[in-house]
Swiss-Prot record:
Keywords, alphabetical: Cytoplasm, Methyltransferase, RNA-binding, rRNA processing, S-adenosyl-L-methionine, Transferase
Domain THUMP: 43-154
Role this protein plays: Specifically methylates the guanine in position 2445 (m2G2445) and the guanine in position 2069 (m7G2069) of 23S rRNA.
CDD domains: AdoMet_MTases, THUMP_AdoMetMT
Protein name, as recorded: Ribosomal RNA large subunit methyltransferase K/L
Matching Gene3D superfamilies: 3.30.2130.30, RNA methyltransferase domain (HRMD) like (3.30.750.80), Vaccinia Virus protein VP39 (3.40.50.150)
Length: 702
């Protein structure tokens, strides 16, 4: 009997133990990452040929203590390598692990190689050659603290390489993991199996090979025992012949069918090729179609199983599409696959929540470095009085109600950008803005007391409901997370897409960027204030301070201003403002753009203006500004500087976003200024619920 070890992906150890026992292994012991077992030579070949779950089959050769590189050398050389190697066999060493002595795996591999080669030369035998690419023997050494474990890898290449997959095509899951997913799915061979996001077909091919009793090792051309002196070719050929006989019989007797689809025609062609190479191509029908086109291939029965490894995203901007995909799959399953089972393997349990289905079972496993979960569902048979579940129903109803009211109002006003929802319901704490046929969801960061998992799942529900209510494709929904802004955070870049969208606001055309910054380039709550500025601008010299992207300057210019002066500290936003002005035919000397610290420029300027708009930050201590600024503390001093630039009879429109702002009317009176609050006049219906979003004043000389 031989002591052996079968490695596997984390989470599959018990499944592998059961498989090995069915093959005849004894004394099976599960450890993290694999199973120790005992077996004769025939079992070695049986496990290599038939294990669908093992990554490698390892034959331990010995252990040694390593306190120095000499200890490693002598420990390896103590093994009788001349009785392990066939004459002329090539080899490679795979070394993993470090300690205080062996600090580099390449150095460790070199010492092992030297010890093996010297074992031959000391006996005056021809030294074996190293072949790193395709060796006859692969020696594995694991160093754990002071103990080195030396073993012969009888697999050669990893056992997940069945020989049917085009190596040029990347697979998101290895074949061994795919086999485990199929085994855990609850699918019964002989019943239909469908993968609506099949990619290169790995799940379906592994299922078909299992169902037709086709050994996973049948198509492999190279093994790790070809240079092993104890290899028994007779037994190996018997094992191989038995596998071939069983495969022919299994294929001839199998009567059910497999169905795969994917939106990418190239991967479907690859899947067909893989299935043909695996010898089960005739059992699988592959089609090019996306999930939206998914339908039950057997509406009259029998019931089957839908299985898939759907895509998941690591980037925030990919989530809307993925949530929509999972939500859509859930609806299709409930509408068309009543009585079927569903099994999905994913690195994102939150995305699986978007299915709006309750799992009967779940399993955990590792896919490389990723922690993954497999969830199994049974789809109840639908009845005539069955009502489809609504995702985030309260939120969806409120959004639908707001849309009905605001869409008509926006059309009448001639605006394309407006707020549809602003945390109307406390449990759905987001803002939803419409930009033409796009939507932006801004998630207000939940407090630390809220469970992060629940908050994320609720956000996914919000996205799914928003897409459903607005009827927009996922690629036209942008997701952002908004926290309380400090200083210049709101101006920091979030992305590098550089995609601009042209929108209309009354008679103005403006550029917005929905992805690259937290804000889009257009403050929607100031819409009416901008229109008022346009109405007040005829024949006047207009100054726009803290101008952002210059949308107020556009309205003033279109309103007939004699000149516009646009001042901001950011070159990026001034260039944006220039684009906005140019889009509306406003260019030339009459429309100046000045990059400067607005407060510093204000103190130095000696020009005169009839109409001034200023919307300063609530607080700023930018390194590029000469001093910190607090709008509550400093607004009177600000008005003093502004008055110096104001022509007789001129007007200042002053706005800020500080909640609870108190205008110092006495301080203004001492400057000879009067202030009229116009906040309510500047709030449009889409911001009617949030009356503190800004405050706005008209200030004139007394």
């Amino acid at each position: 009997m031989n002591s052996l070890f079968a490695s596997t992906a984390r989470g599959l150890e018990e499944l592998l133990k059961t498989e090995l026992e069915k093959l005849g292994a004894v004394e099976c012991q599960v450890v993290q990452g694999g199973v120790h077992f005992q077996g004769d030579t025939r079992l070695i070949y049986q496990s290599l040929m038939w294990s669908r779950l093992a990554s490698r089959i390892i034959l331990p050769m010995g252990e040694c203590k390593v306190y120095s590189d000499l200890d490693l050398y002598l420990g390896v050389q103590a093994i009788n390598w001349t009785e392990i190697f066939n004459p002329g066999a090539t080899f490679a060493v795979h070394f993993s692990g470090l300690n205080d002595t062996i600090r580099n795996s390449q150095y460790g591999a070199m010492k092992v190689k030297d010890a093996i080669v010297d074992a031959f030369t000391r006996k005056n035998l021809p030294r074996p050659n190293v072949d790193r690419e395709s060796p006859d023997l692969r020696i594995n050494v694991w160093l754990n603290k002071e103990t080195a474990s030396i073993a012969l890898d009888l697999s050669g290449d990893g056992l997940h390489l069945r020989g049917y997959r085009d190596r040029a095509g990347l697979a998101p899951i290895k074949e061994t993991l795919a086999a485990a997913i199929v085994m855990r799915s609850g699918w019964q061979p002989g019943t239909p199996l469908l993968d609506p996001m099949c990619g290169s077909g790995t799940l379906l091919i592994e299922a078909a090979m299992w169902a037709t009793d086709r050994a996973p090792g049948l198509h492999r051309g190279h093994w790790g025992f070809s240079g092993w002196a104890q290899h028994d070719e007779t037994i190996w050929q018997e094992v191989k012949a038995e596998a071939q006989t069983r495969a022919r019989k299994g294929l001839a007797e199998y009567s059910s069918h497999f169905y795969g689809s994917d939106s990418d025609a190239r991967v479907i062609e690859r899947a067909r090729s893989n299935a043909r190479r695996a010898g089960i191509g005739e059992l699988i029908t592959f089609e090019v179609k996306d999930v939206a086109q998914l339908s039950n291939p057997l509406p009259k029965g029998p019931y089957g199983t839908v299985i898939s490894n759907p895509p998941y995203g690591e980037r925030l901007d990919s989530e809307p599409a993925l949530i929509a995909l999972h939500s859509l799959l859930g609806r299709i399953m409930k509408n068309q696959f009543g009585g079927w089972n569903l099994s999905l393997f994913s690195a994102s349990p939150d995305l699986l929540g978007s299915l709006q289905l309750r799992a009967d079972k779940q399993f955990k496993a590792k896919n490389g470095p990723l922690d993954c979960v497999q969830k199994n569902y049974h789809i109840a048979e639908t009845t005539a009085d069955s009502k489809p579940a609504t995702v985030a129903e309260d939120y969806a109803n409120r959004l639908r109600k707001n849309l009905k009211k605001l869409e008509k109002w926006a059309r009448q006003e001639g605006i394309e950008c407006y707020r549809l929802y602003d945390a109307d319901l406390p449990e759905y704490n987001v803002a939803v803005d419409r930009y033409g046929d796009w939507a932006v969801i801004q998630e207000y960061a939940p407090p630390k007391t809220v469970d992060a998992q629940k908050a994320r799942q609720r956000l996914f529900d919000i996205i799914a409901a928003t897409l459903s209510v607005l009827g927009i494709p996922p690629n036209k929904l942008v997701l952002k997370t908004r926290e309380r802004q400090k200083g210049k955070n709101q101006y920091q870049k979030m992305s590098e897409k550089g995609e601009f969208l042209e929108v209309s606001e009354y008679n103005a055309r403006l550029w917005v960027n929905l992805t690259d910054y937290l804000d889009t380039g257009l403050f929607l709550d100031h819409r009416i204030a901008r229109r008022m500025l346009g109405e007040m601008s005829q024949g006047k010299d207009f100054l726009n301070l803290f101008s952002y992207t210059g949308s107020a300057s556009v309205h003033a210019g279109l309103g007939g201003a004699r000149s516009t002066t646009t001042v901001d500290m950011s070159r990026t936003y001034l260039e944006w403002a220039e684009r906005n002005l140019r889009l509306n035919g406003l260019s030339g000397r009459a429309h100046r753009l000045i990059q400067a610290d607005c407060l510093g420029w204000l103190r130095e300027a000696n020009e005169q203006f009839d109409l001034i708009f200023i919307d300063p930050p609530t607080f700023s201590n930018s390194k590029r500004m000469e001093a910190s600024f607090d709008v509550q503390r400093d607004h009177v001093a600000l008005m003093k500087d502004l008055k110096r630039l104001l022509r007789k009879g001129g007007t200042i429109m002053f706005s800020n976003n500080k909640r609870g702002f108190r205008m110092d009317l006495e301080g203004l009176a001492e400057l000879g200024l009067t202030a009229q609050e116009i906040t309510q006049k500047t709030l449009s219906p889409d911001f009617a619920r949030n009356r503190q979003i800004h405050n706005c004043w008209l200030i004139c000389a007394a």
